[in-house]
Amino acid sequence: MSKLTVVGSINADLIVHAERHPQPGETLLGSGGEILAGGKGANQAVAAAQLGANVAFVGAVGSDPYAEPAMYYMRTSGIDLGAVEQADTNTGLAVITCLLYTSDAADE
């Protein structure tokens, strides 16, 4: 098994489902909000672990409610989090925008 140490960011991705993308200045109500693990380094570490590597991670999260969800998939993927520090600050956050377009002709 390959050994790998990843040094990078751990963020919490905030995902809210909406019926459509808002217009400039418009407020839409969302539903089904989720907090998922994210961050370039964390995503790379999880991918490597899922491919069978023995992964250790070096990074930091904040001491706020987003820290645990941000590390959830890393922990459940078997990544060694012994070098992850918990800083007296906020965990990095990202708001994810994803648009899915389908053609009316694709009613299969």
Regions found by a protein language model. Name each.
Residues M1-A60, P65-P69, R75:
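Glycine-rich phosphate/adenosyl-contacting loop at the front of the ribokinase-like
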Residues Y101-A106:
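Conserved small/polar residues in nucleotide/adenosyl-binding loops
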